[in-house]
Each structure stands twice: as structure tokens, then as C-alpha cells.
């Protein structure tokens, strides 16, 4: 059974004042692309553990990549809402494989904000076209969420940095043509010694390990990366040396907001699939939808999802106005990742044994959802951030 793409739900008809008529027209364009080019192929990509590169170029041809990027940097000059629409529409069909949001919303901003003009012109227009795929590499074996403890080092030698180290769990890692790498240029300085370097595919000494096998999100390319004395031009340093940790923290709210957006959209989709299923499936001579237990569960989930939508749109509005801080982003990431986990668990239960079968979208959604409470900061870290703000005022 392929992932379902039908979509007729109450949350689709509720007004969302954030979005203009141009946004709505773009959403229809993205929806058609997702239903035509992604939904029918996604199961095959999960079997292959990756998305073909030509899909990225198709996305670029349809204007789905780096929508927010200014025209001066090779982008269409729209706003970030267009990129969030792409994320929502991928979530709507349960497509976790295409790494477009990370490429557009997480990686591209580092290049736009801190890249040298020559580097920007060489890479950003190609990212918009889908000719170059981007990744960011922070996580290392043994460091988890502690960026200040990374061991990958870069030593300055003339007009180059010599980069040595290892990264793991890197989304888009196998397909990536460029990787923003967090490394230590001054290990003695801790967090103040972290810098960001852009490593390109063809640089000698840059290799990729295995495409990591995960319990979910199988179509998403996740890799180990190795840097063995890679000579990176000094012009590929983003911003100033030793400022990498600060740059990462500045962009973290946007990364966590993206996870809220994706989780909310996927929770809505899972509820839609389940509402359709319980109206068709019969047990004990009646529809599942006629059992009070089913109706009560769906009602509670619908209420939780409606609250999540209001919260998510509030966070987006705050971010667009420049007012989303680390605490708000952490609270959102905590709420929406936990919401998705709860929704997929409750809905899978209503599917019964069929929900445990991998060919059903609900089973894949259940496995796909688990990582959301881990990456970009675990739920425990999100709680700590929010609690500190409450208790240390």
C-alpha cells in the first residue's frame, strides 16, 4: 500500500492568516509536484535508502528549493513561508526522504549570512537549481548534542585549513556536494574555538562511510563522513574563525522551528489517514468509527492537533518578526515532536494488526516519528531549556 495522498480534513479549511494568496497558489503547485513526483516513488526510495539526484533537479526546476534566498544570491527572493510550505506538503504525504527542508532552511542560511561573495556565487545558485545538494555536519561519535565537545580539527596552513575528523548521522550526507562542517580551529578555547568550513565533494581526503540503516525515515540519506587531512581553502571559512559555535546557536531556533512545522504537518496527515480508515474498516458488524472508544480517541487527537497548529503558526509568526528565542523554539520542538509520537501511536492502535504492517503508511509514520524527539536536541534537553527559563528568572 502506497503512502496516501488524499487530503480532506477540518484543519485544511481553517484560516491561516500567515499566508497570502501567493502562498496559497504556491502551495497548490507544491502539492501537485509532491503527488506526481514524490508520493508514487517514495516506497521505492525507502527500499533504495535514498532519493535520486534528478528529483532534486526537478524540485529546483519547480522553484521548491531555497525560496527565501535573495535574488542577488541567485534565489527567487520570496520569503521563508514558501520554504515552510514545501516542508508542510512533504509532511502531508508522509514523505521523509527528500532532504529539501534541511538544504533550504538550515544549510543555505549559513552560506548566505557568512559566506565570502565568491563562495556564495559558486554554491547558492546551484543549490537553488538542485544541481548541488547541501548538508551540515555537527554530530560526532560520542558527542551527541554537545557541539562544544567536538573533536574534528582544522589546522591553518597558509591559505588552507587541514581538516581531520569524523562525523556521523549526517542527513543528505551521501548525496551532498557541499557540507558545512563544524570543527575546532583552536581546541584549547572550547566552544570559542569552533569554526565552520565548507567542504566540497571533490576535495581529496573527504570520504563517506556507509549509508546508515535506521528504524525509520529509510528514504532519507544518512551518512558517516570522514576527513583525512582535507585541504580546505581559507576562502571556505564561514564568517570569522572561532565564531562557529555562535553562528550555530543563532540558527538553532530556525532549525527547531522547522521540526515543529514538519511534525505538525505529519500529525495532521496521520489523523486524516486514520479517520478515513476507521470509516471503512468493520469489526463486529459495525464500522470502527461507530465505537465510542474510537470516537473519543480521535476527538482528543483532533483537539491536540488543533492546539499544535495554533502554536506552530504562532511560532512561525514570531520567527518572521524576529522574535523567536531559544526558549520558544525549544518549547515548540518539544510539543510538536511529542505530539507526532503520540498521534502515530494512538492511530496505529486503531489500525490494529494492519497498522503493524510496513506497507501501510501508518506503520512507516510510526517508525519515522521516533527520531523527532532525538535530533536537533532531545526532548530532555528541550525541557531543560524551558525549565531554566522558568526557574532562573
Predicted feature locations:
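Flexible, small-/acidic-enriched active-site or ligand-binding loops
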Residues: 149-151, 202-233
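Alpha-helical interface subdomain recognition
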Residues: 1-93, 97-99, 114-119, 126-131, ...
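Conserved hydrophobic/aromatic beta-strand scaffold that supports enzyme active sites
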Residues: 135, 149-153, 160, 178-182, ...
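A short, Trp-centered hydrophobic/proline-enriched beta-strand micro-motif
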Residues: 130-138
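A short core secondary-structure module
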Residues: 159-160, 164-208
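Short Gly/Pro-enriched turn/cap motifs at secondary-structure boundaries
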Residues: 100, 127, 142-145, 169-172, ...
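Helix-loop "lid/cap" segments that line or gate small-molecule binding pockets
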Residues: 105-114
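Short glycine/proline-enriched turns and hinge-like loops at secondary-structure junctions
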Residues: 78-79, 146-148, 172-176, 190-193, ...
Amino acid at each position: 500500500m502506497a503512502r496516501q495522498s488524499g487530503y480532506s480534513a477540518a484543519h485544511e479549511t481553517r484560516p491561516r492568516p500567515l499566508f497570502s494568496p501567493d502562498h496559497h497558489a504556491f502551495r497548490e503547485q507544491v502539492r501537485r509536484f509532491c503527488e506526481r513526483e514524490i508520493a508514487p516513488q517514495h516506497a521505492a526510495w525507502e527500499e533504495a535508502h535514498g532519493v535520486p539526484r534528478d528529483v532534486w533537479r526537478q524540485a529546483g526546476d519547480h522553484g521548491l528549493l531555497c525560496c527565501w534566498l535573495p535574488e542577488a544570491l541567485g534565489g527567487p527572493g520570496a520569503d521563508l513561508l514558501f520554504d515552510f510550505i514545501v516542508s508542510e506538503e512533504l509532511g502531508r504525504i508522509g514523505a521523509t526522504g527528500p532532504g529539501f527542508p534541511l538544504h533550504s532552511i538550515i544549510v543555505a542560511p549559513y552560506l548566505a549570512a557568512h559566506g565570502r561573495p565568491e563562495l556564495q556565487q559558486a554554491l547558492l545558485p546551484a543549490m537553488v537549481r538542485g544541481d548541488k545538494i547541501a548538508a551540515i555536519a555537527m554530530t560526532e561519535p560520542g558527542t551527541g548534542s554537545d557541539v562544544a565537545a567536538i573533536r574534528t580539527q582544522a589546522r591553518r596552513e597558509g591559505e588552507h585549513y587541514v581538516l581531520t575528523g569524523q562525523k556521523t548521522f549526517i542527513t543528505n550526507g551521501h548525496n551532498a556536494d557541499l557540507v558545512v562542517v563544524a570543527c575546532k580551529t583552536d581546541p584549547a578555547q572550547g566552544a570559542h574555538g569552533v569554526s565552520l568550513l565548507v567542504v566540497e565533494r571533490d576535495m581529496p581526503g573527504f570520504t563517506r562511510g556507509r549509508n546508515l540503516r535506521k528504524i525509520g525515515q529509510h528514504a532519507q540519506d544518512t551518512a558517516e563522513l570522514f576527513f583525512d587531512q582535507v585541504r580546505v581553502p581559507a576562502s571556505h571559512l564561514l564568517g570569522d574563525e572561532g565564531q562557529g559555535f555562535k553562528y550555530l546557536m543563532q540558527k538553532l531556533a530556525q532549525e527547531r522551528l522547522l521540526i515543529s512545522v514538519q511534525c505538525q504537518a505529519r500529525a495532521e496527515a496521520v489523523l486524516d489517514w486514520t479517520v478515513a480508515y476507521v470509516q471503512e474498516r468493520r469489526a463486529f458488524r459495525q464500522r470502527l468509527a461507530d465505537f465510542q472508544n474510537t470516537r473519543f480517541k480521535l476527538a482528543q487527537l483532533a483537539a491536540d492537533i488543533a492546539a499544535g497548529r495554533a502554536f506552530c503558526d504562532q511560532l512561525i509568526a514570531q520567527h518572521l518578526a524576529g522574535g523567536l528565542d531559544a526558549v520558544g523554539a525549544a518549547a515548540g520542538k518539544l510539543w510538536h515532536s511529542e505530539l507526532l509520537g503520540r498521534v502515530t501511536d494512538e492511530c496505529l492502535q486503531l489500525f490494529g494488526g494492519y497498522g503493524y504492517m510496513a506497507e501501510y503508511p501508518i506503520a512507516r509514520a510510526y517508525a519515522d516519528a521516533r527520531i523527532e524527539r532525538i535530533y536537533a536536541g532531545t526532548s530532555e534537553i528541550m525541557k531543560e531549556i524551558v525549565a531554566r527559563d522558568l526557574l532562573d528568572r
